[in-house]
């Protein structure tokens, strides 16, 4: 039986930093209001780079670290809700940029759960025995999706990309997973046109900015997602005490505080970086993972047992437990 492992990690963020003080110059807000409610103090914003540009930088870093060329890749899966275009896919643009002419490439849309869903999907490709190497990337330019006059959402999000190189392994690394969706609660987090421009339709295109019912999403995370994480651990071959780190979607520092208590783990096992990057949706978990490797918390030698969990629009939520 074939197994998969994460062999390399990388991330990339745009150069421009926008602080809470900067936002206070263009909207009715201040640093204390934002940081006390979210933990966020700044975010990176793309001036000219597209989602595929950010993802391409990550892909190049991954290949350089592994010492491989694009021609050695079998697939590219790119998780995003801010694609360059609906067609072609952002993943296809990345494929062309890095010369991965033998790889199939596609986008996956599962909002802030996107990277977890994409990594789970990629693991199945490797486990089939037909594929040996692939890139899994989360990339977002959310600065293009928010209404910059709406302080309830604009202050939360940032741009960035992160990803992993997934390769075949002789040993098992993926220990447990849980992927979930609940479309009946889809209206609490929306982005994009809900209507159509067509002479054959009576529908009108609705406002396309990202919209969120913050309280509902907050309650969903600390209730449903925490319960799902606990259940995934209970059904896995490990105990909660075996987890070295839990890398959760970086939406809000207060959510992480409550999740740690609900799951029954020390808050120190939940690293955070939303104070530097804001909420980068599908990019948040791979950026955090890459930083943990850079800081030496996760040596990338298979010695650490790590839980990854994303949650967001759809509603969607997903958890993976693996050794890294």
Swiss-Prot record:
Q: Where is the active site?
A: 112, 249, 279
Any one GO MF term held by the record is:
3-oxoacyl-[acyl-carrier-protein] synthase activity
For domains, the record's comment is: The last Arg residue of the ACP-binding site is essential for the weak association between ACP/AcpP and FabH.
**This protein's record includes keyword Lipid metabolism:** yes
Q: Which NCBIfam families match?
A: fabH, PRK09352.1
Spell out the protein name for this chain.
Answer: Beta-ketoacyl-[acyl-carrier-protein] synthase III
Entry EC no(s): 2.3.1.180, 2.3.1.300
Description of how activity is regulated: Inhibited by the SB418011 antibiotic. Not inhibited by cerulenin, and weakly inhibited by thiolactomycin.
Q: Where in the cell is it found?
A: Cytoplasm
Report keywords, A-Z: Acyltransferase, Cytoplasm, Fatty acid biosynthesis, Fatty acid metabolism, Lipid biosynthesis, Lipid metabolism, Multifunctional enzyme, Transferase
Q: What does this protein do?
A: Catalyzes the condensation reaction of fatty acid synthesis by the addition to an acyl acceptor of two carbons from malonyl-ACP. Catalyzes the first condensation reaction which initiates fatty acid synthesis and may therefore play a role in governing the total rate of fatty acid production. Possesses both acetoacetyl-ACP synthase and acetyl transacylase activities. Utilizes short straight and branched-chain acyl-CoAs, with a preference for acetyl-CoA.
One GO cellular component this record assigns the protein to is: cytoplasm
Top-level enzyme category: transferase
Q: What is its main location?
A: cytoplasm
> What family does this belong to?
Belongs to the thiolase-like superfamily. FabH family.
- Which GO annotations describe the biological process of this protein? fatty acid biosynthetic process
Q: Quaternary form?
A: Homodimer.
Pathway recorded for this protein: Lipid metabolism; fatty acid biosynthesis
InterPro entries on file: ACP_syn_III_C (IPR013747), ACP_syn_III_N (IPR013751), FabH (IPR004655), Thiolase-like (IPR016039)
> Reaction catalysed by this chain?
malonyl-[ACP] + acetyl-CoA + H(+) = 3-oxobutanoyl-[ACP] + CO2 + CoA; butanoyl-CoA + malonyl-[ACP] + H(+) = 3-oxohexanoyl-[ACP] + CO2 + CoA; 2-methylpropanoyl-CoA + malonyl-[ACP] + H(+) = 4-methyl-3-oxopentanoyl-[ACP] + CO2 + CoA; 3-methylbutanoyl-CoA + malonyl-[ACP] + H(+) = 5-methyl-3-oxohexanoyl-[ACP] + CO2 + CoA
Which residue pairs form cystines in this protein?
none
| Stretches for region ACP-binding | 250-254
